[in-house]
Amino acid sequence: MNKPLTPSTYIRNLNVGILRKLSDFIDPQEGWKKLAVAIKKPSGDDRYNQFHIRRFEALLQTGKSPTCELLFDWGTTNCTVGDLVDLLVQIELFAPATLLLPDAVPQTVKSLPPREAATVAQTHGPCQEKDRTSVMPMPKLEHSCEPPDSSSPDNRSVESSDTRFHSFSFHELKSITNNFDEQPASAGGNRMGEGGFGVVYKGCVNNTIVAVKKLGAMVEISTEELKQQFDQEIKVMATCQHENLVELLGFSSDSDNLCLVYAYMPNGSLLDRLSCLDGTPPLSWHTRCKVAQGTANGIRFLHENHHIHRDIKSANILLDKDFTAKISDFGLARASARLAQTVMTSRIVGTTAYMAPEALRGEITPKSDIYSFGVVLLELITGLAAVDENREPQLLLDIKEEIEDEEKTIEDYTDEKMSDADPASVEAMYSAASQCLHEKKNRRPDIAKVQQLLQEMSA
């Protein structure tokens, strides 16, 4: 017979049945991420960093529960059920807290219907809601950025909105991509690459090469959420055009296979060019500086028009024939009424190796884009990937610690494949990256300041 659970019961002593029930509550909507970032060391520092969270996340691909693995690991520190329940209540996961210690959950929460209980803290703190697909009206700046029709509801679908994009049939897109040929484009086929939410194929429309992204449901992404991201991408691109944002040409939504059609970027992604994929030559330092400045221009345009990208990374920075940077993938973008506003979301999204500490807690703020851009600047300097499990340190952003501890210098990490790197400008870009990567969001510069730092670097 199992012993009753008490606040002093060790987490490591929970039986498999209880762990399975906990994972049923905590695994969905990535509640385990919220729990992981809430767990602290005795010193008050975070116990789990981005790399740890990536490892837990990878377990989903093998069919394992990240919640169970997280509790197995944390359980080695002699933490108790009481400790766990305190954190579950803190992050508003009341159902699993009640499962463990019913009396530990506030009576006001338990007495509410389930839907209200899940959102009880909204009356007292920041709103925690599912990502909406609305786009806030935005002022016109130097480049075209028109607000959506205010007479239409925010949650309208793209089929009923005036998007100004061409509507392709899925049959047309099959035709222009050779039936979505899976052979790599580098080998004469059509497949160009794979992203977080779909596969990109090369196509040809009226003698013009285009890129067709066929969206596909990934682990933990439902069909409904994929449709929301599809709608969001179109709405953002319909209202914002800028030389440093990728150009959306059209879409297809007449079948179960949602597709987006973009202008073709001959030089692929910054990630691929930094890794010299397919034997391409390394980017010069001059080109890297140009890419950094172009990306900063694009981020500034988004922020000044009240948009937070939420997934700035080298894979989402595309390069045209002149190596002009084009920010892509706006499916996770979020509209914010005020530039400095921080809101909360119940779903933590983005790429972990680039995510700011507050983003891992579910905060949505422009300063998280700044942090992610800091990682991109490190990639430009070093030519290294943001994360590599076979490297030490595994997270690229951790080189900042080594440099601050005077164990190494930025020269030790500068990409040796560059022949024109200027030590002074490399140091200046690293200084900008270091400021972007400050743990405290309010200590990071805004994007206008980052632009200034990058311009001074090239002066």
Swiss-Prot record:
How does this chain assemble? Associates with MYD88 and IRAK2 to form a ternary complex called the Myddosome. Once phosphorylated, IRAK4 dissociates from the receptor complex and then associates with the TNF receptor-associated factor 6 (TRAF6), IRAK1, and PELI1; this intermediate complex is required for subsequent NF-kappa-B activation. Direct binding of SMAD6 to PELI1 prevents complex formation and hence negatively regulates IL1R-TLR signaling and eventually NF-kappa-B-mediated gene expression. Interacts with IL1RL1. Interacts (when phosphorylated) with IRAK1. May interact (when phosphorylated) with IRAK3.
The UniProt gene name for this protein comes to Irak4
Question: What residues does the Protein kinase domain cover?
Answer: 186-454
**Residues with N6-acetyllysine modification:** K34
EC class name: transferase
Broad class of the protein's primary localization: cytoplasm
Give the protein's cofactors. Mg(2+)
Alphabetically ordered keywords of this record: Acetylation, ATP-binding, Cytoplasm, Immunity, Innate immunity, Kinase, Magnesium, Nucleotide-binding, Phosphoprotein, Serine/threonine-protein kinase, Transferase
The GO biological-process annotations, alphabetized, read as: cytokine-mediated signaling pathway; innate immune response; interleukin-1-mediated signaling pathway; interleukin-33-mediated signaling pathway; JNK cascade; neutrophil mediated immunity; neutrophil migration; positive regulation of canonical NF-kappaB signal transduction
Query: For this protein, what is the EC number?
Result: 2.7.11.1
Q: Can you tell me which residues bind ATP?
A: 192-200, 213, 313-316, 329
Q: Which organism is it from?
A: Mus musculus (Mouse)
* Any Pfam family: Pkinase
Domain Death spans what residues?
20-104
Which SUPFAM superfamilies does the UniProt record give?
DEATH domain, Protein kinase-like (PK-like)
GO CC annotations on file: cell surface; cytoplasm; extracellular space
* Listed name of the protein: Interleukin-1 receptor-associated kinase 4
List of catalytic residues:
D311 (proton acceptor)
Name positions with the PTM N-acetylmethionine.
M1
Q: Which residues carry this modification: Phosphothreonine?
A: T342, T345
Q: Where in the cell is it found?
A: Cytoplasm
Describe the outcome of a gene knockout. Answer: Mice are strongly altered in their responses to viral and bacterial challenges due to a severe impairment of interleukin-1 and Toll-like receptor signaling pathways. Malt1 and Irak4 double knockout suggests an additional role of Irak4 in B-cell antigen receptor (BCR) mediated signaling pathway, since the double mutant inhibits B-cell proliferation.
